[in-house]
Amino acid sequence: MNSGTTLHLDRLSLETPSERTCFCIKCWESVPSTSQVWFGGKCWHSDCFKCVNCNKKLDPSSEDFSQDDQKQIFCKLCVDICNGCSTPICEFNAVSNSQANHPCCSNCRAFINSNAFGKFKGQHYCLPCLRKQDEENQKAVMESASGFIPLRNIAQTAENTSLTGQNQGFQNPHFIASDSPSSVLSGRMQNTSSPTNSLRPQLKVQTNGYETPGDINSAKSYKDIQKDFLLKPKNSFVKTSPSPLANGPSFRSANASPFDSCDSFHSGSSIPIEPVSSRQSSVVNNNSVQQPVAYHAFVQSPTENGTLPQLPKNESVVNPPPLRRSSTMNYKSVSTTTSPSKYGYVSGRIALSPIHLRGALRDVTNKCNLKVPRNRNSLSNLDEYYVNGLESDETPTKARFPRYPTVFNKLDDKRLSSEPNGLKKRLTNSSNYEASPRAKSLNLSQVSLHQACEPEYNRSSLVRASDVFTSNVFDATEESANELAIRISELQAEVGTLLLEATSLASIIEQQTPVSPEAFKQELVADLNYRLDYLRKSFQPELSTLLLRRDALSTTVSKLQNAYSTVMEETAYLNVKNTELVSLNNQLERELAYLREQQHKKRTSSSFGIFNNDKKSNRTISTPSPRESFSRLQMVASSLGFRPKDNKDKESGGYNKRNSKIDLKKSFSKRFHWKRDSPHMSSTPSISEEHLASEEQEDFVPAVGHCKLCGKYSNELRAHYQDCVSSTIDRQYQSKKSESPVWALNPDDFDQNRLTLLRVPTLIVSCINFIESYGMDFEGLYRKSGATSQMKKIVALLRNEDTVLDPSEDISAVTSVFKQYLRNLPNPIITYDQYFPFITAANCASFQDKLDGFIMVIKSLPPAHAEILQLIIRHLARVAAYSHANRMTSKNLAVVFSPTLIRDPDNSRDVIDMTVKNYSLAFLIDHVHEVFA
């Protein structure tokens, strides 16, 4: 699997695969054949074969452990088992529902990082797979929820919105109310009175040869559906006269169809009249699931002279009723007053609300029922009711629309005219009852008359109500219908999703057993503890790394502070030394000028002053100044036997007194721990007793004779002697200057090709033993330098194989010999070929990487050099342990030994890499047990 963690369950073996020496992969030491454990191609000590986490020793013969990609061993108690593949998880896991999993996608098995994954049904998915699962889930939810429009195809929803709107009264067939039977009107108004049915899911129902508008997949076009609703007229037209409000925008928007122009149904045009039989075929069955329809009703308007327009000759109206003046119906309008129309405009969203529809229909019906005459004994009241109640110049909404005269159905007119006496006879005979004593009582004639007139009145009222809804309430645009259709589809989708979620939650609740509060609390606490433990384990490696970095930074800061302090001390020390050197230089220049002046005077004098026998005439008495010193000529003359006369008259007095000024050298030496006490030049130089003579001493030199310097005979002995003294002094000075100690480098100890040591020299071992025996608490150990004479003596002793030094030897001289021997090696202890690998390992940021790099460099050294380096580093670690007494910490020791142990082959990077070398050597001293484990 590619989840980032691969387990290697290799077979274990206690046998050595080869006869060569094997090294433990953990401790880097050789493993004897009796305690070797082989696993995954690597060798371990039997004691090193432990769990990395709990440090538990593992049994090689069992299989209760596993290995990750980093070659680390884990026991089964320290790792989790994956819920998906039942294999151990060695690195980190992904927890879902208190179950651990590999950090990989459950679908494509790709490794998941912490910023790009999600959980779905208890499984982990990457983002592409999660989107795919979401789409499949949404598709399943939409397929399971019937009757709603999928939200993913909004364009298709917008295209089919007009089909749904056609069922809601915006694009409907047109009919004449007077030619429709009562059953048709009652059925349609019954459907209209239940507006909540429009919110039900629509199914595919085959009606009148086409699929209902509720089917969004209907392949029929709008024109085909229009043809099914608007049938061809059969040469029957009713001519209407123009009305005052026929040209108004509200009238056109309320009555015009989106499929036709507004002029097709304008006042004065031909209105198609459908036969009753053809319209009955298009009536929706009450048992079907088709949405209720509120159709448009067109009512004929009277002419200006008060007469009705005439029908064609083949169509006639039997006994048309006279014009009646109807009473005004107090119906509360839902029209808004913000429309530019004079008579208001009803918003499509408000008009389509089921609450408004139901309330409007209820108000109209109640008003119609209240208009029935209560005094049934009075025919005059009944006649007045029919005269005043059926016609009005105002609509129920008080919008003052054109009058809607009542046009009686031909079937009802025939039924009324077929009665024995007729309507006029009944109206005439009704006056007899008014004068009778029983005028207020009910009789069968009045009841029958009321029953005969009530259906006609109800039809007329319903026609008016239908006209109210079609002309005023359902005044909406196609855009609002589209918005409503989209909103209904969204709500249906949400309802389906909520139903599925409720069903799943109910099933889960039924399956689960009731849990007590205490048990639930315990389970919750256990789950939280598990999650906290998981978080602690997941953050533990990062915290360990941060802690190591913090310690490294703290160490670096402390080292930098110590280095800064040391630099400041050395700077102060150098300033003091510089001041001393300046004063010494000035004094030497004055002495040199004085000597040159004296020599010039002697050469230009007529006689050789110091060999003149005349003590009084040619003697020059000079009192030397306090800054005078012996000349080289006087020193050589004294060594050759020319002794000056002793002057006992004057002895040294005040010049031998101690200088009263403060000795700055001692104070600075005590403060800054100077390596060695150097002669401090005071402002007043010390003068010997021989130089305090008040008179110049004279020696007797013969004029002719042999020279005591070169042994030659000369007639001008004085001049020859002067030249010989000068040449002798120069030879002695040059021989003394060229003297240098000879170090004991035995050629047999080196490889002639690589110039590396073949064995550990006895000088190194002897010096280390002497220092650890007598000088561990010596202040300034390895910092102070010894005298050259003592160094020569120690080298002579060690050359004669006298490895045991006397305790009286100078510690500083021994340390100087030790350092000088390491400095004079032709190839340093850390050889030239390992210089750059050593610098690379020192630049590693991680502690473990740096440690591994130093170990690899040490293993690459020649055996003798690796052994000497281990001997020196362990010795310096023991010296640093006494830093409270000798003031030599690991940092100070690294500064002293890094130039001798680590050298650049070209001597070009000594200054650049000086800080890195010092830090690296201090690291080796501080971690000697880890490096040389």
From Swiss-Prot:
Signal peptide (residue range): none
Protein's job: GTPase-activating protein for Rho-type proteins.
InterPro entries, per the entry: Rho-GAP, Rho_GTPase_activation_prot, RhoGAP_dom, Znf_LIM
Biased composition (Polar residues): 325-338, 619-628
The keyword Repeat appears for this protein: yes
PROSITE patterns: LIM_DOMAIN_1, LIM_DOMAIN_2, RHOGAP
Keywords tagged on the record: GTPase activation, LIM domain, Metal-binding, Phosphoprotein, Repeat, Zinc
Domain LIM zinc-binding stretches: 22-80, 81-129
One GO cellular component term noted in the UniProt record for this chain: medial cortex
Single GO MF annotation: metal ion binding
Region of interest (Disordered), ranges: 181-200, 304-338, 415-435, 605-628, 641-660
Covalent S-S links between cysteines: none
UniProt modified residues of type Phosphoserine: S353, S625, S738, S740
Record's protein name: Probable Rho-type GTPase-activating protein 4
Sequence ranges of Basic and acidic residues compositional bias: 643-652
Residue numbers marked as site, Arginine finger: R783
